[in-house]
């Protein structure tokens, strides 16, 4: 996957290129990330990248010309098929379904705003989609962009050691993930569930699915409203609720 990022702080993206899963993906050639800094497209000796908004008010906006030129440079490098995304609290909220959709694109250009945002005409003429990581305001688009890159890259074939790791993540099937355990078998009087030690793969699968359904019901019940549960899932969830009521 090819990724271009428009940012005033390209150094921040070393967190993506140099560390963890995404760092290995870059090293192995599965993820290609390039940055364009609007400051490199300024024409004054101060490298000015902000400007006052029309109509007054507090704060500044990113200057149109350097930002637009940086986007054009990224588009030229990416090719016509690249999708341009502006990270904005006004955009569509990123969830696993959205991540799956974005992962189908081979080339993405992410525009990171700063100050009070960017000129609306840049959004109208240069941006294909706006995305948000939540209903809160950050100082810039860099952290949302890194969040998006990390989430999307996990779905690129070969990035994870086993594709099943991505398929079992929370939200991959609309449910929260089940509990996980490693050694020791007993920790401060808390034991690993016996079914996980049984070696019975079918029983383990059913237990994990039931725990996933139950955890979703308890922590994010609204997620279940959007799902058409199978007969198996409905039965497991009913058993979970019955067991929970008995221990209440």
UniProtKB/Swiss-Prot annotation:
Its EC number is 2.1.1.228. GO terms for biological process: tRNA N1-guanine methylation. Pfam families: tRNA_m1G_MT (PF01746). It catalyses: guanosine(37) in tRNA + S-adenosyl-L-methionine = N(1)-methylguanosine(37) in tRNA + S-adenosyl-L-homocysteine + H(+). One of its GO terms (cellular component) is cytosol. S-adenosyl-L-methionine binds at residues 113, 133-138. It comes from the Bacteria. Transmembrane segments: none annotated. InterPro entries: Alpha/beta_knot_MTases (IPR029028), tRNA_m1G_MeTrfase_C_sf (IPR023148), tRNA_m1G_MeTrfase_TrmD (IPR002649), tRNA_m1G_MTases_N (IPR029026), tRNA_MeTrfase_TRMD/TRM10 (IPR016009). Keywords: Cytoplasm, Methyltransferase, S-adenosyl-L-methionine, Transferase, tRNA processing. It is found in: Cytoplasm. GO terms for molecular function: tRNA (guanine(37)-N1)-methyltransferase activity. Specifically methylates guanosine-37 in various tRNAs. Homodimer. PANTHER family: TRNA (GUANINE-N(1)-)-METHYLTRANSFERASE (PTHR46417:SF1). Belongs to the RNA methyltransferase TrmD family. This is tRNA (guanine-N(1)-)-methyltransferase. It comes from Shewanella sp. (strain W3-18-1). The lineage of its organism: Bacteria, Pseudomonadati, Pseudomonadota, Gammaproteobacteria, Alteromonadales. The gene is trmD.
């Amino acid at each position: 996957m090819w990724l271009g990022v428009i940012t005033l702080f390209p150094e921040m993206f070393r967190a993506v290129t140099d560390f963890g899963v995404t760092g290995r993906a870059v090293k192995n050639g599965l993820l290609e990330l390039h940055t364009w800094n609007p400051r490199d497209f300024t024409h004054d000796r101060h490298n000015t990248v902000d400007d006052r908004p029309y109509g007054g008010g507090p704060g500044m906006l990113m200057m149109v010309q350097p930002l637009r030129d940086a986007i054009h440079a990224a588009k030229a490098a990416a090719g016509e098929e690249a999708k341009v995304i502006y990270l904005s609290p006004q955009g569509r909220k990123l969830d696993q379904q959205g991540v799956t959709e974005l992962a189908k694109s081979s080339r993405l250009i992410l525009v990171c705003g700063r100050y009070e945002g960017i000129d609306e005409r840049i959004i109208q003429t240069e941006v294909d989609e706006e995305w948000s990581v939540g209903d809160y305001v950050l100082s810039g688009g860099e952290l949302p962009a890194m969040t998006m890159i990390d989430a999307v890259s996990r779905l690129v074939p070969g990035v994870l050691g086993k594709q099943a790791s991505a398929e079992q993540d929370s939200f991959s099937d609309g449910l929260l993930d089940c509990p996980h355990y490693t050694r020791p078998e007993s920790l401060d009087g808390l034991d690993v569930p016996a079914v996980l030690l049984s070696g019975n793969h079918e029983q383990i699968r059913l237990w994990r699915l039931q725990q996933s359904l139950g955890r979703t019901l308890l922590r994010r019940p609204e997620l279940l409203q959007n799902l058409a549960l199978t007969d198996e899932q409905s039965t497991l969830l009913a058993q979970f609720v019955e067991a929970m009521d008995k221990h209440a």
